[in-house]
């Protein structure tokens, strides 16, 4: 990334807040412009985070209602994540170039329209297409939201309050998506998408009234690079999803592989010659940072795939309702928070590598235990025990990964580096899920099962699905072992991470 692009991303304009000139204080009631701006940015951030998980709980009902096979079922969530993660870096550049308020409002309008189309989808193709549109919109909204928090609110109490709200919406969005998805799916899975429409309209109106346009920084957009990166992942996932059913030498899997490989080669060539590349390759020259990026990619994939498999298992195999399935995830959310809190203390005394291996060991044990489950297993303690242990491990590994990221580049380049890390973490989800799904589908078919809707399965086919999903957990355990191997190359010390933590805290304080 060029120096000019870095400055455009990380040196925000400091507009004076509308309607007052005195130094702001939170001791008095916040002004209307502040409430409107925070509501606009915070609510749409919540929706984009929710939509990464809200469909997970609804998947079995969507599959039964629309008659999807296993491949089609997973594309309902994969389409959103691929578009979101693959185009996120380009979305941030669009805001810098054409104005963040304008880009934000365009993204909100597109997201709201796509949500309505999801709610009224008449078949699987229409739903996947609308989810793809949602992901494109979210890829514009997410980075421009971050920038708008910095440019809309002046340094001091108001910005700190806005950052707190924004961070809270980001943190609870994924968990709320699981819980709210279950409650809404009990009535209709379509409500899980239609709930976005009124909130999207509200955010659009408030943004138009309260947000101010930022200065535009004309720069060459690397559209080709962003599209090629997304195409690489999409073609790979599509080929992997069709291979077990069609045969690996069938035209679609082979063609997808050729397209993915060709797109990867083209992406490397484009990024090496681009004036303003979407992915600066110089960030990958450091071994520590390269290992860190790989760990974020695989770790994000493990967490995402685990949530999908658990949601599928408790509903399709154990027969839980959507609401009961969402409640089953509550201990998971609590355990992640506890693990993160414990990890924040552990990194003061141990190197990130030690903490990461400890958290990964918890995840590995949980998945190995989960792979032994059978249809007759009860939620407590048979399912909740490995679920909580895995969640503790996820919480533990998240903190040293984030702090190591800051230690790898320093605060002066944390903006573009964090953006690439978030992209890799997002794309890891559908990529790891696609590989694990190959194992699940192959095992299910080998045991006499089917890839059709669960409502049409007999007892033998349900047993085959049970064995397939638990076999998939073994593959997921293998992914955790692979992460552990990558982590061995991360050599940051506890002192470096402590310094990064202090620098980040000072920066967040303004």
Stretches found by the model and what they are:
Residues 2-209, 350, 371:
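Transmembrane-helix bundle of Major Facilitator Superfamily
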Residues 34-50, 55-57, 70, 251-259, ...:
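12-transmembrane solute porter fold
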Residues 62-63, 94-95, 180-187, 240, ...:
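Interfacial helix-cap and linker-helix signal at transmembrane-aqueous boundaries
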Residues 119-126, 208-211, 240-246, 268-272, ...:
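Transmembrane helix-loop junctions and nearby membrane-interface residues
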Residues 106, 158-170, 219-228, 253, ...:
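Cytoplasmic-side transmembrane-helix entry/capping segments in multi-pass membrane proteins
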Residues 451-469:
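Short, membrane-exposed interhelical loops at transmembrane-helix boundaries
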Residues 2-3, 164, 185-298, 302, ...:
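Hydrophobic transmembrane-helix bundles of small-molecule transporters
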Residues 48, 77-80, 84, 111, ...:
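Structural signature of transmembrane alpha-helices in multi-pass secondary transporters
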